[in-house]
Amino acid sequence: MDTVDGYLAEILAAIRPLAPRRLSLEDADGGVLAEDITAQWPLPPFDNSGMDGYAVRASDTAAATPGAPVTLPVNGEVAAGDTAEHELAPGSCLRIMTGAPLPSGADAVVPVELTDGGTTRVAIGQPVAAGDSVRRAGGDAAPGDVLLAAGIRLGPVPLGLLAAAGRASVLARPRPRVCVFSTGNELAAPGTPIARGRIWESNSFMLASAARQAGADAGRRPSVPDDPDQVLALIEDAAGLADLLVTSGGVSMGGEHDAVKAALQRLGTVRFRKVAMQPGMPQGFGVVGKDSTPILTLPGNPVSAFVSFRLFVRPALRALQGTTDDHQRTARAVLTAPLRSPTGKRSFLRGVLGNDNTEITPLSGQASHQLAALARANALIVVPEQVISMQQGDVAEVISLDD
């Protein structure tokens, strides 16, 4: 029987990162940067106002007090986007908007809140110092500064920075394309009538969502019955359109209707095994299709499929993008109740983190089919293979499901 760590290591050793591509900023969203980005121009590119107010020479406000304000003539206005060259005469001011270029001769901005808001003459009730409310050119980044290092995931802030730096495209590894489907004669599409012995198919929706949350471009196919020919046809079709295939069901140990296993054993490129874990013991990994597309075959019980995704599919997605971040960050929390675990298997029990994530409460529904109980959980409690019980007050390793 394989260990959890050994099986994961086998998967990660076989995954080859996707080739970097030149992507527009829109298409790079969720991708992983494959080049260092340096500033070609100063950020911001020019001195500008950090507030709505009045551009002044700071020395002209030195005598201002609330009881005896300094009054200056307002000789015009500078708006954001104004490309004209404005010059500030001594003893005067210019009304200025946030982001507008600082006029020549000005060295400070008086926020409008510190004035009477005048349009032809303005009373200033307190002095300002040179540099107040001014955003200096290059104050955020100077030319040659590294703005973003290769290997980071491109999300809202990095993409905003790239745009602010004038970049329209970047070299990045794209979001992996993932195809998910489930197998089983018992499965019916949600929203359709079901007879006794049938259930609504849920795993493909859950796993596709989990893949998107993990940074993939994921889609699902309708479930297929326990027919190896149909399963193999779907796998061969999807392999040419995806970077990773994920199946659910059809891999149990000794089952007579294990269509996924029967289909893939014809190819001889996927290895099925038992992994010493609960839930999720039956697993399979290999490659399919002319492009050797990786495939992970997960158990059919919903909780088993979800835990398997967290432990094996999510790290595989990160490996496809060439990231070196932690595949499964863990923390430690105090148990609020005792628990039991089978010997020789690493257990992943559902629990609820509380008290600022310092305590963990095991849930009562721990069976591998209990999806409603999983929906109440926000963490997995990791119980090592050699531990069969833990007591209230013991410190447990936990995996947060909120990240």
How should these model regions be labeled?
Residues 47-49, 62-67, 85-89, 102-104, ...:
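Solvent-exposed alpha-helices and their adjacent loops that cap or buttress functional pockets
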Residues 1-69, 154:
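Intrinsically disordered, low-complexity, positively charged segments
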Residues 12-19, 36, 58, 102, ...:
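Structural signal for hydrophobic packing residues in well-ordered secondary-structure cores
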Residues 2, 21-26, 34-35, 48, ...:
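Flexible glycine/proline-rich
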Residues 1-5, 168-298, 302-308:
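Helix-rich terminal scaffold detector
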Residues 2, 54-225, 360, 364, ...:
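Short, glycine/charged-enriched hinge/interface segments at domain edges or termini
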Residues 29-42, 83-95, 142, 285-294:
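Short, hydrophobic/aliphatic alpha-helical segments
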